Structures are given as C-alpha cells and as structure tokens.
Amino acid sequence: MDLCQKNETDLENAENNEIQFTEETEPTYTCPDGKSEKNHVYCLLDVSDITLEQDEKAKEFIIGTGWEEAVQGWGRTSPAACIWPRKIPKKARVGEGACSDCLVCVNLSHWSLQTKPPTEGGPEKDQSSPSQTQAAPQGPSTASRAISDICFPTYFRAEKKSLQIKEFIWCNKDWAIPGTNRGKASGNPSGGAHRGLSIPGPLTSRALLVLPPLKASLSNALDVLGKKSKNSFLQSEEKVLDVEKDGCVAYAYGLKTADGKGEKRASELAKHPMVNDTPSSPSPAAQISLLTDPEQRCLHWSLLSEKNLACPPDPSNVRYLAALQLLQKRGVQSYKSKFKAKEPRSPVITRKHVLPKAKQENRPQMLETKVFPRPVLPSLTVSRVIIPVSTHRIL
C-alpha cells in the first residue's frame, strides 16, 4: 500500500514540475517599472482631449443647421420638417406637441409666446386667446397649441370650400338670368359665417360687360368663319369671271375693228353663259390695258392658222397678209417658168449641180408639209428658191 502511495505522489510532483518549467520558459513582458503602461494610457487620453477640443472649435465657427445629423441619422430632428411633404398630423393631445420634430416651429412658438399680446378679433384669434391667457396653469398644452397653429394653421376649410362653390353657382345664375339673381342676392340675408362672402352689384355688372355669354360667342364665331369662307370663294369666282370677260370684250372689240364680219361674231359672244352670270362689270383701266397693245392682246397672226386665231389682226396686218398671198401665187409661177427656161441653157450638168437643184425642189415641199400645214409663210420658202444659181464658176 505504501509503495502505491509513494508512486502516486511522485507522479504528481513530476507533473507539477513540468508545468512550472513550461511557465518559466514562456516570455514575460513585465517591466521593472510600471511607468511605461501609465504613460501609454495618459498619451491616449491626451489625444482624445485634443480631438475633443478641435471638434468644439470647429463647431463654434460653423452654424449648426442639423443637416449633418439628419443625413447621417445621428439625430431625430430636422431643421425644416414642416417643409417636407408628409401626412396631415392628427389633433394634438393635451400633453403632446403637434410639431415636435421641427426645430424652426419650436423656435417660432417660443418667440410668438413672448411677443404676441392677447387680442380679440376673428375666429382664429379667438382660439389663440384662451391659450395665451391660461399660459400659467397649462404650460405644455398652450405650447402645443401654438406650435400647431404655426405649422398647420386652421383656415376653416369648410368655409373656404363653400365660398368657391357659392361663387361658381352664383356666376352661372347670373349668366342665365342676371336680373332675378341680383334681386335674390340683394334680398337674401347672409348668415354669420358668410357675411364676408356677399358680392356687390357693380361687380356683377362689370363681369357682364367684360365677358359675353359663351353661346352667343360660339354662334358669332361660326357665322364669321362661314362669311369669311363665302367671301373668299366669291372673290375667287369674281376674279376668274372678270378675266374671262376682259378677254371676251377685247376679242369683240378686235372683230368690230378688223372686218365687217364682227357683228356676227359679236352676237356669238353674247351667247356666252359666263359673261351673262357676272354681276359686276370690269374696270375701265383693265379694258384700256388689254386693248392698247395688240401684241399683248393676241398672238402674232403669222404663227397660227386662220382657224386657230384667238384674236383678229389689225387692218395693216390684214393688208400685209393679202400681199403675201399674192406673192405666194405669183412667186411659185415665176419660179417654175424661170427654172424651166434655165434648164436648156446649161451645157453640162454635173452631179454637183444636180444635187443642190433636187434639194431646192424638195425644200419648199418639206417646209409646207411638216412645219406649216397650209402655206402661210411663202416669203420664207420663196426667198430661198428665187435666187438664180449660176452653172458656171466665176473666175
């Protein structure tokens, strides 16, 4: 038994020695003097004090608006909470403030309580007067009422709505029957809530003078538009008819001066339907301007055939036409006789002389057939043919 106990004690001692040996081998950071730890703590405290002083100095130069706290979420108040859109607050209780979140409203409430004297006036002043007179016994309730009045003042919204509706209905009645409504408005006694809403008589007369009724204005506007469209259409038709009538008058005038057949053609012009429908006659200035210049009045007679002539020519032009017709007949005959007389005199006919003669014979026919359906311009064709062609070369 003793041996067993001795072995156990030896084992326990050995274990204790091993533990002590490991503890001795671990590095110890203890200093001989404890001043270093204290100095370190003091340094940290000094740094914190310096930072606090710097922060306080910075806050002194910056006006505190509360925006930093509102953005970072450190505070529960904002400088202009009443400006932001939010729900309409409920009625404040006796011990609660209606706008406790708004710093501006709190400052205004304190200032209003100090400066405003108790006065009696309208319904708003009647409500604020008992809160100011009973400021000593009921401190929190008066402050809350003043704050609520500043942030969200009560404007008697029911009366405001009734004012708008009453004005609207009254205006409609005035437009329909102005005389009866004026009598009703002057005769009906107004209530206490609507004493300031009674409308005088001159205002209604001014409104009626300035603003016409809507139905009449719409009908007048439509009539004016219809008249404008009709006038524009009639003016365009009159212009067309005047131009046609001017042309026809010029044509009739030319017929009478040109030939004796003008009477027959003038009767045909009288049957024209458009001239008979015209209500107004053309101005004399337009007739003079059309009849003075014969070139402007109609195209040149030599460029068109007799059937297609729009206006007859002057007497001088008629004489010239007759002369040209005579020249045409005589010129062709003389040309043929001269050409036949010259043919036997030519001793030798070469190919060079035959080709231009054949061309000369074919030229007037081509001009007459292709360019002019009838020989209206013989002078142009004959002038090229009548020139005698010498068969012998001149040395």
Curated annotation (Swiss-Prot):
Which stretches does UniProt call biased (Low complexity)?
A: 128-141
An example of a Gene Ontology cellular component annotation for this protein is: nucleoplasm
Q: Which Pfam families does the entry mention?
A: DUF4529
Domain of life assignment: Eukaryota
Question: What segment(s) does the record annotate as region Disordered?
Answer: 115-144
Listed name of the protein: Uncharacterized protein C16orf46
